[in-house]
């Protein structure tokens, strides 16, 4: 082989090596891109969650069960993995768009003002909560009908230890409403008398129990079918509003809790003693009627409060308050649950199961 032949062979070998290297590099790059794409896809998949979403205002039929992006907590928020939520009278109002201006809510929206779950992640400014904590509470702007929701620290408290997550999810909004109406606003004390309208409903069932826990005498109204239920809750006097006018039985009460409004509210002023109070959840008590009888009045607007939730949990664990769960449905059946809520004749609460109950016994 001549010198020129050896040069040609060497050049060919170098060219072959270069071509092989380029092919290997291309294969390596393709492999890296494929791995990265799979990793990103998996990461994106992890950031998705199941939720019930409304893209329009309207009836329960606007709700859709779909995949949405999992929220990331801000520095003053905690991410909660939701085990259960429940249905409230506020949900149809939210879906109707009633709160859009007052609360600044925007579409699409996820309903759900009750949650019970486990803290998954905390923001830098969260000091009380930590990952793994079992909590229950009331997210101010909803979002509970999903696998994850962000909450402020003051919107949740430690879950009552004696309750399952499904039971705990039936508590926050309705129990807070009853507590802030009777304890914070009306200052119910031992041996006072309280009239609770709609005593078998979500708020009413808690109101009867809270008033009894405070040592009050309780008169409650409900339909014929719920008379025994009122007694089970602890009501001293049960009135069947379909047969008897409540003002024929209730006299000189210290406080009235009204979740009905209209005629029921208008007739309630006459049964309250001088200096007593009428608390309405749906309307502003008539100032002229109050002044004429020397009464106090309040229109109730519930808000999340860790202290109140903690006190409610204490009474629950002491056996003085018990949530009434009438039905547990999977999250995918939220439309069915919402239709039941719109009837306003549900006894206690309907719960939405979002995940299985954790097996840890200390939660």
PLM feature spans:
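Bacterial N-terminal signal peptides
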Residues: 26-37
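C-terminal hydrophobic helical "lid"/dimerization subdomain
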Residues: 47, 309-363
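Glycine-rich phosphate-binding loop and adjacent beta-alpha segment
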Residues: 259-321, 354-363
